[in-house]
């Protein structure tokens, strides 16, 4: 899934290009490269009203609630309930299996601040910014 992508980002292909790049990077490293065929990969589109990620000083509306600095830690925050709800739109994901489904949320920003939120039942949401850098400075490194 991606967040902070508006209608224009989706129409021009920026959204899908960002998602495909993230999938390529993720499965370009071991052990995921070897075991890629064992994964079901789905893209869920959630259109945001605004393009780009907001900050404490520049609030932008995002479908999944992504914002910089609104958490107590100062890190990127997200609305996990909406993320889980949308992830359940994938053909093989249910409320019962969401704890076995890693969710990667590609953020429409080039600011580095990736973080993963994990819960005791095994549920996880990884927030990954887009990358303009080459390896090993991109988000593979």
Where are these predicted regions, by residue range?
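Nuclease catalytic cores that cleave nucleic-acid phosphodiester bonds
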Residues: 104, 111-114, 121, 126
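Intrinsic-disorder/low-complexity loop/linker signature
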Residues: 13, 114-115
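Propeptide-to-catalytic entry region of secreted or membrane-anchored zinc metalloproteases
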Residues: 1-99, 106-109
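Compositionally biased, low-complexity repeat tracts
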Residues: 61, 65, 116-118, 137
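Short pre-active-site segment immediately N-terminal to the catalytic Zn-binding motif
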Residues: 5, 9-16, 120-141
């Amino acid at each position: 899934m991606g967040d902070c992508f508006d209608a224009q980002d989706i129409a021009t292909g920026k959204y899908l290009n960002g998602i495909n790049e993230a999938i390529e990077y993720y499965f370009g490293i071991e052990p995921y490269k070897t075991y890629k065929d064992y994964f079901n990969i789905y893209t869920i589109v959630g259109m945001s009203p605004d393009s780009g990620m907001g900050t404490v000083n520049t609030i932008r509306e995002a479908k999944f609630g992504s914002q910089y600095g609104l958490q107590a830690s100062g890190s990127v925050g997200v609305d996990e309930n909406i993320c889980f709800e949308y992830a359940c739109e994938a053909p093989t994901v249910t409320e019962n299996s969401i704890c076995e489904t890693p969710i990667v949320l590609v953020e429409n920003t080039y600011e580095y601040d990736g973080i993963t939120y994990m819960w005791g039942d095994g549920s996880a949401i990884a927030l990954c910014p887009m990358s303009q850098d080459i390896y090993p400075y991109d988000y593979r490194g």
